[in-house]
Amino acid sequence: MNYIKRNLENVVRQVTREYPVLLVTGPRQVGKTTMLQKLMEGTERGYVTLDDLNERYIAKTDPELFLQLHKPPVLIDEVQYAPELFTYIKINADKNHEPGAFWLTGSQVFKLMQGVQESLAGRVAVLSLTSLSQAEISGGTMKPFTVDLEDLSERQKEREQADTREIFERIYQGSMPAIVSGINSNSQLFYSSYLSTYIERDVRELSDAIDSLKFLRFITAVAARCGQMVNAAEIARDADINQTQAKDWLTILETLGIIFYLHPYSNNLLKRLVKTPKLYFYDTGLVCYLTKWSSAETLECGAMNGAILENYVVAEIRKTYLNCGKEPYLYYYRDKDAREIDIVLEHDGILNPIEIKKTANPGTELVKVFELLDKASTPRAKGAVICMKPGLSAIDRDNYIVPVWMI
């Protein structure tokens, strides 16, 4: 297997020179450990995983002894299993002031962050690793996605061009490293195993009373609503659980890095806006598996093609920021009259409205809705329609046409 270089590597090197502690979060099997072990090659950094029950026991019951056994520089894998370590890592960092002393990984984002914020504030750099991005798979320099003509032109030169069929093959295959690298050639078998391990292991770590079959029905109901506003009542009905359970289980999915939310854009000058977030999966391959699409071809022609394409584009844009160690300020716009903008990208004091469509020939009617942002206190800048057009183009002077493969 060839190692796929991760865009986050340069950020890891940078923060290792500046902070005593690095924490890389992200769901299981996205390559956190693989990336860090690759960067460790030729160094004296040690490695220990808390998946090892004996090591976990020592870390929880005698964290001081654990750090004597595993002296820095060290990589501690799955650190969420022993939050007792954080206080002792803080003591070590304050005493020795050694940049890069501790590399930590963890798969339970919110649970981890609570302990980190309480114990390691100011001493830790936190980075998020997701499944592979388009840029990592096909090559090209990673920069945060912007609706800037110079940036878009540069992307057009670097990225690997793909037609509609190829885009839907990427969407259907998913972006987990084991599938993309060829370790697991059967994506259906991979996701079946992934879900079983995920539900029986990680979910039960957070809630041991969960019924596995009910949770599988639940996550399937959630996948069927990717790209939609969250409706816990509908999800609960389809999964045969109560609404409180549905909300709690959505929190578990977010905690484990399976889903994320796009919150509605709000501004004190904009009135009558909805307040409900939209829900997306980090990996569209998992969505396709859960919603039982048999091939990329059937998905491309199916009823969910628009929703899953939107999920793919939003997730890919989000990755371009996370892979540079930056927070993505992505929102969506929807008012009480159901007028909607798929993405509102806020950066550098401007707003870029973005629509996502399966068409290859978007028209001016798609960008009329962008004018709704003109009432906001933050100025509206260039807009874009991300679609299946083969190359970079424009609808007019203020709105570009951007192929999906250029993200």
What is each model feature region?
Residues R45-P73:
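Short glycine-rich substrate-engagement loop in P-loop NTPases that contacts/grips substrate
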Residues F86-F110, Q117-S119:
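Conserved catalytic/switch belt of AAA+ P-loop NTPases
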Residues H70-L85:
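Conserved P-loop NTPase "ATPase switch" module shared by AAA+ and STAND
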Residues N2, A135, G139-R318, L322, ...:
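Interdomain hinge/linker elements that couple catalytic modules in large macromolecular machines
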Residues F110-V126, S138-K143:
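Short regulatory helix/loop adjacent to the ATP-binding pocket of P-loop NTPases
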Residues T105-V109, G115, T130-L132, C387-K389:
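A short beta-strand-to-loop transition that corresponds to the Sensor-1 phosphate-sensing loop
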Residues M1-P27, T33-G46, L50, H70, ...:
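A cross-kingdom feature that marks ATP-driven nucleic-acid transaction machinery
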Residues N54-R56, Y81-P83, K111-L112, I179, ...:
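Catalytic P-loop NTPase motifs of RecA-like helicase/translocase cores
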